[in-house]
UniProtKB/Swiss-Prot annotation:
Transmembrane segments: none annotated. The keyword Lyase applies. Gene3D superfamilies: 3.40.50.920, 3.40.50.970. The keyword Nucleotide-binding does not apply. GO terms for biological process: carbohydrate metabolic process. InterPro entries: Phosphoketolase, THDP-binding, Transketo_C/PFOR_II, Xul5P/Fru6P_PKetolase, Xul5P/Fru6P_PKetolase_C, Xul5P/Fru6P_PKetolase_CS, Xul5P/Fru6P_PKetolase_N, Xul5P/Fru6P_PKetolase_ThDP_BS. NCBIfam families: PRK05261.1-3. Its cofactor is thiamine diphosphate. This is Probable phosphoketolase. It comes from Lactococcus lactis subsp. lactis (strain IL1403) (Streptococcus lactis). Belongs to the XFP family. One of its GO terms (molecular function) is aldehyde-lyase activity.
Length: 822
């Protein structure tokens, strides 16, 4: 039986750590000749990279932690995966996966011999190779850690509903200063040890950032303990006065990590066997504070140049100077080669590797085997079970729209709220997928009309519940929205999605912008993952923009920002789907599609306020499938017939106003031939240069079928910023666009006045339509002038009523559709 705490075993662990750290340091500088001292081959200029790139400072600390995580897996037969918050030390995951064989399984050309090791060294941070972070190219990684702050949020999402898994989550002490990371310490208030896995957070307290000390590093152990105990954790420390007494570190780390794992197991046992922690008691989850110096074991001082301090060069080890490349060594500058050789040989590589590049026999069995290897844990590659959700038939939840009631408000007000219509569908999904679907949000689920979900589930919340002051809160539930943090909600969803489950994150449209950058990072991950043949795909990430810009008359200007549409439109279109359904049926049909799509970001803009319902189930299905459709009942031109102008819209309020505008024109000039186009999927309109943009793009012929040849007037009511549609039509080479979107004007005002602020309203759209008809000699001057004057007088009346009485003119807000004159 293996004695995992014996000196012999810890010495083997130390050797494995040295092997990993040797490789992690060497690949920054060398592109070949990786075992120069073992093979007796002196380093030449051609062996070195011309421009070494990488981060050394965090590597040795993280390989130390990775080695001890392997020990825990072996000792406790524990399923575990590694998450590196300070992900710029990418070698800390690349190298362990190479040593345990996972890397070679993913990349067969990177063999576990001298030739394969040389290839690995060359490709690291090298053109055409791999990045310096824990990218999607790295086996075992599901968190790149390039943009700091999300490791605990991702870890939480990853272990929800996975009771057998532990996330070994390393938090950089610089990362710990970010807002998202600081708020994510609260994640333990939402983890139920009865049904979920666990996180073992390790604060990698190496002391320094790029050029500054870290706040936690200059905080006493006593105060750090108070801080984490106040958050509900049970802190324990790994530190030693002599930073080079590595065996002392190993012995202490083994004791600390053993106690941490045993505490986690006891917490889970108490919850699962005795139903503990289900009444407001939060477990004292362990956290490990590891003071592992930056650049640990690397060059200690700059003895070759620069100023001196106490007779020595400026410190590198345990200093910010170790952050990136600690030596100015390259193929063009070999002045510090002796220091590099001294550094690398300090790991005694001849005791770790054979001359053929293989690992010494005694070290080959140190790493776990098969799927117990952290780099081969299925959780990190699309999940243990990444199948799509079991979906109900969305049409069973649809509104009964027909030609008799389209464009009108339905008798039950709740049926006119698209988000409430969606909530019925989501509630059924919860029942069909009790452990594989979750809804996340920042305290907005009730506000965003997911009312029906609360009939079948609760919010998951582990703190004390105080009824009747609290509502729909329980230790078990499929909704997690009780922390007011968009970062947390998005991070939880990303972790949940990247481990093969499906969820959605709904937020106020303007404040979804808080996680712009997180969505960018997720896009970059799935884009890069798609290039890795060994990687499985993922469920799509579903984000819902609601409480939208034209429905924020009550909260005002700060709550008005539809810019997420523009932000995501800039990304590679093959990975982005942006939907603007105009009613409840189309929203249902869109989600039926979104939940079946893979490795996409689905951004759905949805209305939560009572609005007219427009489309039959068949029309909604076509709109969701095709992303765009000509609506015959709102057009006066027949299919294939030349038109005088095109009306188009995308979004709930734009659709109402554009349809009302064309109705106004039709009432006075029924001879006008126009086509109405409803756009649901924005990406169908785009025509972008470069690869990975064409998956859903309309051909030029298809685009012309909808919008006519260049020069055809197009009145476009749009939910977002106008320049997005303008840029799309510019790329299409289509002149004649007049877009009415959000113009960054708004306030606390009336519902209809919000539309007038940006001239999205029907009257401004109708004025533009009549003007182009007049300019193109489709209508006489007298008729056009009279119509335009009437529209302007109506707008003046609107202004007077809203400013004097604080209400809208009922004719505007209560308008309903009636058949066109044809």
């Amino acid at each position: 039986m293996t004695e995992y705490n014996s000196e012999a075993y810890l010495k083997k662990l130390d050797k494995w750590w040295r092997a990993a750290t040797y490789l992690g340091a060497g690949m920054i500088f060398l592109k070949e000749n990786p075992l120069f001292s073992v093979t007796g081959t002196p380093i030449k200029a051609e062996n070195l990279k011309a421009n070494p790139i990488g981060h050394w400072g965090t590597v040795s600390g993280q390989t130390f932690l990775y080695a001890h995580a392997n020990r825990l897996i072996n000792k406790y037969d524990q399923k575990m995966f590694y998450m590196g918050g300070p992900g710029h030390g990418g070698q800390a995951m690349v190298v362990p996966s190479y040593l345990d064989g996972s890397y070679t399984e993913a990349y067969p050309e990177i063999t576990q011999d001298l030739e394969g090791m040389s290839r690995l060294f060359k490709r690291f941070s090298f053109p055409g190779g791999i990045g310096s972070h824990m990218t999607a190219q790295t086996p075992g990684s599901l968190h790149e850690g390039g943009e700091l702050g999300y490791v605990l949020s991702h870890a939480t999402g990853a272990i929800l509903d996975q009771p057998e898994q532990i996330a070994f989550a390393v938090v950089g002490d610089g990362e710990a200063e970010t807002g998202p990371l600081m708020t994510s310490w609260h994640s333990i208030k939402f983890i139920n040890p009865k049904n979920d896995g666990a996180i073992l957070p390790i604060l990698d307290l190496n002391g320094f950032k790029i050029s500054n000390p870290t706040l936690f590093a200059r905080t006493s152990d006593v105060d750090i303990r108070k801080f984490f105990e106040g958050l509900g954790y049970s802190p324990r420390y790994i530190e030693n006065d002599d930073i080079h007494d590595y065996m002392a570190y190993h012995k202490l780390a083994a004791e600390v990590f053993d106690k941490a794992i045993e505490d986690i197991h006891q917490i889970q046992k108490d919850a699962r066997e005795d139903n503990r922690y289900q009444n407001g008691e939060i477990p004292a989850w362990p956290i490990v504070i590891a003071r592992l110096p930056k650049g640990w074991g690397g060059p200690r001082y700059n003895d070759w140049s620069g100023p001196k301090f106490d007779g020595k060069g400026m410190p590198i080890e345990h200093s910010f100077r170790a952050h990136q490349v600690p030596l100015p060594l390259s193929s063009k500058n070999m002045g510090t080669l002796p220091e590099f050789v001294k550094w690398m040989t300090s790991y005694q590589p001849e005791t770790l590797f054979n001359a053929d590049g293989s690992l010494k026999e005694e070290l080959r069995d140190f790493a776990p085997k098969g799927e117990m290897r952290m780099a081969s844990n299925p959780v990190t590659n699309g999940g243990v079970d990444s199948s799509n959700l079991v979906l109900p038939d969305w049409q069973e939840f649809a509104n009964p729209i027909s030609e008799n009631n389209r464009g009108k408000l339905l008798p039950d007000t709740n049926d006119n709220m698209d988000m409430n219509v969606l909530s019925k569908y989501f509630a059924e999904i919860v029942k069909l997928n009790p452990t594989r679907f979750r809804l996340f949000g920042p305290d907005e689920t009730m506000s965003n009309r997911f009312w029906e979900m609360f009939k079948v589930t609760n919010r998951q919340w582990m703190q004390v519940i105080k009824n009747p002051n609290d509502e729909f809160i329980s230790p078990e539930g499929r909704i997690i929205d009780s922390q007011l943090s968009e970062h947390q909600a998005e991070g939880w969803l990303e972790g949940y999605t990247l481990t093969g489950r499906t969820g959605a994150f709904a937020s106020y449209e303007s404040f979804l912008r808080v996680v712009d950058s997180m969505l960018t990072q997720h896009f970059k991950w799935i884009r890069q993952a798609a290039d890795q043949k060994w990687r499985h795909d993922y469920p799509s990430l579903n984000v819902i923009s609601t409480s939208t810009v034209f429905q924020q008359d009550h909260n005002g200007y700060t709550h008005q920002d539809p810019g997420m549409l523009t932000h995501l439109a800039e990304k590679k279109s093959d990975f982005i789907r942006q939907y603007l359904p105009a009613d409840g049926n189309t929203l249902l049909a869109v989600f039926d599609r979104a939940f079946q799509d893979r490795s996409k970001i689905n951004h759905i803009v949805a209305s939560k306020q009572p609005r007219q319902q427009w489309f039959t189930k068949e029309e909604a299905e076509k709109l969701a499938t095709d992303g765009i459709a000509t609506i015959d009942w709102a057009s006066t031109a027949k299919d294939g017939e030349a038109v005088d102008l095109v009306f188009a819209s995308a979004g709930a309020e734009p659709t109402i106003e554009t349809l009302a505008a064309l109705h106004l024109v039709n009432e006075v000039f029924p001879q006008a031939k126009f086509r109405y186009v409803n756009v649901v999927e924005l990406g169908r309109l785009q025509k972008k240069k470069g690869a990975l943009n064409q998956e859903r793009e309309l051909s030029d012929e298809e685009f012309e079928k909808y919008f006519g040849p260049s020069g055809t007037p197009v009145i476009f009511g749009f939910h977002g910023y106008e320049d997005l549609i303008e840029s799309i039509f510019y790329q299409r080479g289509h002149d004649g666009l007049i877009v009415h979107g959000y113009r960054e004007d708004g306030d606390i005002t009336t519902t209809y006045d919000m539309r007038v602020y940006s001239e999205l309203d029907r009257f401004h759209q109708a004025i533009d339509a009549m003007q182009v008809l007049y300019v193109n000699r489709k209508v006489n001057q007298g008729l056009a002038k009279a119509f335009i004057d009437r529209m302007k007088r109506t707008l003046v009346k609107h202004f007077e009523v809203t400013r004097n009485e604080g209400v809208d003119i009922p004719d505007f807000t209560e308008w309903v559709w009636s058949d066109l004159k044809k």
